Amino acid sequence: MCGGAKMSVTNTKWVLKERPEGLVKNENFELIKEEVRDIQDGEVLIENQYLSFDPTQRMWLTDLPGYLPPVQIDEVVRSGGIGKIIESKNGNFSEGDLVSGMIGWQTHHIPSENDLKTMRKVPDVLPIPTMLNIFGSTGITAYFGLLDVGNPQPGETVVVSGAAGATGAMVCQIAKIKGCHVIGIAGGDEKCSWLKECGVDDVIDYKNSNVAEELTKLAKDGIDIYFDNVGGPILESVLFLININARIICCGSISNYTGEQMPVGPRNLTMLIVRRAKMQGFLVLDYYGRAGEAIDDISKWAMEGKIKHREDIQEGIENCPETLNRLFTGQNQGKQMLKI
């Protein structure tokens, strides 16, 4: 900060007060204002700019086991995002640096020592929403999930559920770049039209058609790769149609995130044996060390006009709960985020 008297900074934050059931409600949380303490040696103060909203955040609000521990009562709600460093006592970061990482539902953030190690500097060369979308965890998830786990080959049939979401749309487009026939599953005319704009070969509107019947018609030669963002009955429908040596990439299970009990699994997992197929889960956290590979390729494809993207930007820290719900009501159009 500039010399002279230091101005006090007020942080506005959402903390969890009770475990939600179904869609979240404002009363599940408390919006608190508090003065930010002085930073110590080795610390930085971040002014948050944009928050990323992803379906997995809803699962973090339950007490079910996951790849990260549940958000505890009276803790700030966990969320990734991008912010600007406005004060630094750490030699690795300067005032004005843009950084991405877990910053939470709040306007300001002093990361812990461990959290600061995971913060990545963001080049100030593109709009922040673009960086948070295709060059952030969304793009990295799509890239490594499809290419590293799925290993697509030209001519193969790739099915993507949640295809109009931020990750799903990226997966569809990367699969097309790799020469695959792509079938996208989404809900509603607008989202299905968006997928056609992205070059998807065939689109299934799960809200207005029978997914199992449509898959049987469209995937006449079977399914080689399924990128699963939703779980539930759609996964079961796909399993009946997989080819020998098919690869099922388990990225998310949005259909189950608002429940309080673990869902019943697919009844036809024996198809994995019959078809000698691979079903593998993965986490983008495991690939952050290789993020440069994804960013290089995605940058090249974007410059060549092969990648389309769009963002759904809400505004105001007070609207965090409503913004999260948009992912589960189908209101979001593109990558869901919030400008603070």
Provide a role label for each language-model segment.
Residues V77-K84, E95-G162, K306:
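NAD(P)H dinucleotide-binding glycine-rich loop of Rossmann-like/cofactor-binding domains
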Residues Q106-T107, G187-W194, P263-L269:
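Short, glycine/polar-rich helix-capping loops at beta-to-alpha or helix-loop-helix junctions
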Residues K6-V9, L285-I340:
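C-terminal hydrophobic helical "lid"/dimerization subdomain
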Residues E35-F53, T62-W105:
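Glycine-rich beta-strand-centered segment in the early N-terminal region that forms part
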Residues N210-D221:
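Short amphipathic alpha-helix with an adjacent loop that forms part of the alpha/beta core around
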